[in-house]
């Protein structure tokens, strides 16, 4: 029972996703969806959004500069070069499929993927 301006950042993100899902889109575009959230809220909301997307059987395109976020939320990570943006590499994260973002962060392969993506970004800098 709060006015929209009184909601926390995490609740606003959840409401935005629910509002988007109400239109029943086939594909969701999530452009830096967690950038305005503190770290603890970011982890909680990412699990919630991941679960909603899976439950609803949706495809989501996540745009982020946060490597941890990309590995924890995605089935596939596409690394782009600097301008002009071209596909530099594609990482298939199928070994992590079925895990929540929090579970992925604890998985041994999380750091392997993170480091591989980081190295590619360093090379393009």
PLM region spans:
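Helical segment within the ABC ATPase nucleotide-binding domain
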Residues: 42-57
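Conserved beta-strand-loop-alpha-helix hinge in the C-terminal portion
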Residues: 82-112
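Conserved signature/switch motifs of ABC ATPase nucleotide-binding domains
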Residues: 2-5, 23
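Hydrophobic anchor residue at the start of the ABC signature
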Residues: 17
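Catalytic Walker B motif of ABC-type/P-loop ATPase nucleotide-binding domains
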Residues: 28-31
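Conserved H-loop
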Residues: 57-63
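Conserved catalytic segment of ABC-fold P-loop ATPases
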Residues: 72-79
